[in-house]
Design a protein with these regions (language model features):
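Flexible hinge/capping segments at coil-to-helix
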Residues: 18-20, 116-131, 219-223
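Secondary-structure end/capping motifs
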Residues: 220-294
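A local structural motif
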Residues: 20-25, 49-62, 77, 150-162, ...
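Pocket-flanking alpha-helical
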Residues: 36-41, 61-98, 110-124, 142, ...
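Pocket-lining segment of extracytoplasmic ligand-binding domains
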Residues: 87, 157-161, 165-250
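Short loop->beta-strand "edge-of-pocket" segments that line small-molecule binding or catalytic clefts
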Residues: 25-31, 125-137, 237
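Short, low-complexity disordered leader/linker segments with a strong preference
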Residues: 1-24
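Extracytoplasmic "Venus flytrap"
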Residues: 20-43
């Protein structure tokens, strides 16, 4: 585990660069699966107000793809990934992207589900020889493989069609596939249309989503990173103190009813503190990626993490 003190330079020019606030910071806005702190920020502008104190402008590009966030980070047009799947962060780092994890966005094993509309399919063991739709190389994919292994099956026992969550749900509801990998608000959408849950991440993976930045931005603007994390914590505090309003914001952003948001909110642990258990989960994630053939180069997960 790296500390900020060990990753910042000591020369006078480096100190000057580190203390000069950036003119603009680009931070992803990702509301799925149910990113309540981000939705709160969209409504009360906590991050923008915090950076206004240093005359720093904020852009919030909506980049939902876990693969595209690190690509944009590497290109220099993104500074902070507000909510990035642990799978995506590890894959990016193994492919040479100089990404650093600076906190945890959420842990939500119950929010990531394998679902089916076929009443004959009741457990993951029933998926042998079946077709599943969902995004490859993601937390959902990891849950599928871990669940199949627990059920005594192999990845080759099912056919996985790689597609985003909404079309996966549609394909399942239209009975074009036997099951789908589903998260967040789409779980309720699928249930309302007659689908049921075969399994979720409980007992398999913690479904860790991280907060990340580029090492270059961290080195150049460590104070901006701290500024962002403090503002993010304020959004989490708002959630705890003003639940009803937070759920109203989230319902409006997702198309859910406030009561549905209230039912789903307990699935999520938004504590940003990175714990030893989080490190263990990220190491488990790397093992999944290597075993699935999605990752070629093994990395030291501890070197991926910076504690501020």
């Amino acid at each position: 585990l790296l500390t900020l003190a060990s990753t910042t330079g000591c020369g006078s020019q480096e100190k000057k660069a580190a203390t000069a606030p950036p003119q603009v910071v680009n931070i992803t806005y990702v509301k799925s699966p149910l990113n309540i702190p981000s939705i709160i920020d969209k409504n009360i502008n906590t991050v923008s107000k915090a950076f206004a104190k240093t005359n720093t402008g904020i852009n919030f590009p909506e980049i939902n793809s876990g693969a595209k966030q690190p690509e944009t980070l590497a290109a220099g047009s993104l500074d902070i990934c507000s909510a990035l799947g642990g799978t995506s962060a590890i894959l990016a780092a193994s492919n040479g992207v100089d990404v650093k994890i600076i906190g945890i966005y959420s842990r939500a094993p119950q929010a990531f589900n394998i679902m089916s509309k076929n009443p004959e399919l009741k457990t993951l063991a029933d998926l042998k020889g079946k077709t599943v739709a969902g995004p490859k190389g993601t937390i959902l994919h990891q849950i599928l493989l871990a669940g199949l292994d627990k059920a005594g099956l192999q990845a080759s026992d099912v056919e996985l069609l790689s597609m985003d969550i909404p079309p996966s749900v549609t394909a399942m509801l239209n009975e074009n596939v036997d099951a789908a990998l589903v998260a967040g608000a789409d779980v309720l959408r699928a249930q309302k249309a007659g689908a049921h849950i075969l399994a979720n991440g409980e007992g398999l993976v913690d479904a860790t989503i991280v907060i990340a930045t580029s090492n270059k931005f961290l080195q150049t603007h460590p104070e901006a990173i701290k500024q962002y994390l403090e503002a993010h914590k304020e959004n989490i505090a708002f959630l705890h103190k003003n639940q009803a309003q937070a759920y109203e914001f989230t319902a409006k952003a997702t198309g859910l009813q406030p009561a549905e948001v209230r039912a789903m909110a307990p699935w999520y642990n938004f504590d940003p503190t990175l714990t030893p258990q989080d490190l263990t989960e990220l190491e488990k994630t790397q093992e999944f990626l290597l075993k699935a053939g999605l990752q070629k180069n093994k990395i030291d997960i501890k070197n991926l993490i910076v504690k501020l």
